[in-house]
UniProtKB/Swiss-Prot annotation:
Belongs to the three-finger toxin family. Ancestral subfamily. Orphan group II sub-subfamily. GO terms for cellular component: extracellular region. It comes from Naja sputatrix (Malayan spitting cobra). Expressed by the venom gland. Binds with low affinity to muscular (alpha-1-beta-1-delta-epsilon/CHRNA1-CHRNB1-CHRND-CHRNE) and very low affinity to neuronal (alpha-7/CHRNA7) nicotinic acetylcholine receptor (nAChR). CDD domains: TFP_snake_toxin (cd00206). Disulfide bonds join C24-C45, C27-C32, C38-C63, C67-C78, C79-C84. This is Weak neurotoxin 8. GO terms for molecular function: acetylcholine receptor inhibitor activity; ion channel regulator activity; toxin activity. It is found in: Secreted. Pfam families: Toxin_cobra-type. Keywords: Acetylcholine receptor inhibiting toxin, Disulfide bond, Ion channel impairing toxin, Neurotoxin, Postsynaptic neurotoxin, Secreted, Signal, Toxin. Residues 1-21 form the signal peptide.
Length: 86
């Protein structure tokens, strides 16, 4: 009986989604060391480079539910593993 109960507990733990959360870099600088744990539903890390005017660049990194769209002259890279948006 104890073996059956233990087996059921193990199967339940394995089959349940234990709430894995993604970790992404989150900062506006080119060189970044600040991480954030993404919220539920955010399964994408992104790195965006925005060109505001000639020789003026803005870096944005963070979590998202989907890969963000860009404007002309902007670049975005998306990935789905921990700390992949370096």
């Amino acid at each position: 009986m104890k073996t059956l109960l233990l087996t059921l507990v193990v199967v339940t733990i394995v089959c349940l989604d234990l709430g894995y959360t993604l970790t992404c870099l989150n900062c506006p600088e080119m060189f970044c060391g600040k991480f954030q744990t993404c919220r539920n539903g955010e399964k994408i890390c992104f790195k965006m480079l925005q060109q505001r005017r000639p020789f003026s660049l803005r870096y944005i990194r963070g979590c998202a539910a989907t890969c963000p769209g860009t404007k002309p002259r902007d670049m975005v890279e998306c990935c789905s593993t921990d700390r992949c948006n370096r």
